[in-house]
């Protein structure tokens, strides 16, 4: 079972991962060269 330290690390990692994913998605969607398809 997870203790508080493991849970905190996992939540922090998941938050950073989602944040990076959203930023990357935004850059791909905002880049004009991808809109021509």
Swiss-Prot record:
GO cellular component terms given for this protein: endoplasmic reticulum membrane
Keywords annotated in UniProt: Endoplasmic reticulum, Membrane, Signal-anchor, Transmembrane, Transmembrane helix
Binding partners and assembly: Component of the oligosaccharyltransferase (OST) complex.
Transmembrane segments: 9-29
Source domain of life: Eukaryota
Cell compartment(s), UniProt: Endoplasmic reticulum membrane
Lumenal compartment segments: 1-8
SUPFAM superfamilies: Oligosaccharyltransferase subunit ost4p
InterPro entries hit by this protein: Oligosaccaryltransferase, OST4_plant, Ost4p_sf
Chain ranges on the Cytoplasmic side, renumbered to this chain: 30-37
Record family assignment: Belongs to the OST4 family.
Name assigned to this protein: Dolichyl-diphosphooligosaccharide--protein glycosyltransferase subunit 4A
UniProt main location, coarse: endoplasmic reticulum
Pfam family membership, one: Ost4
Membrane topology: Single-pass type III membrane protein
Function: Subunit of the oligosaccharyl transferase (OST) complex that catalyzes the initial transfer of a defined glycan (Glc(3)Man(9)GlcNAc(2) in eukaryotes) from the lipid carrier dolichol-pyrophosphate to an asparagine residue within an Asn-X-Ser/Thr consensus motif in nascent polypeptide chains, the first step in protein N-glycosylation. N-glycosylation occurs cotranslationally and the complex associates with the Sec61 complex at the channel-forming translocon complex that mediates protein translocation across the endoplasmic reticulum (ER). All subunits are required for a maximal enzyme activity.
Native species: Oryza sativa subsp. japonica
């Amino acid at each position: 079972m997870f203790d508080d330290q493991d849970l905190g690390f996992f939540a922090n990692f998941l938050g950073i991962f989602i944040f990076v994913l959203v930023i990357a998605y935004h850059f791909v969607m905002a880049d004009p060269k991808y809109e021509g398809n």
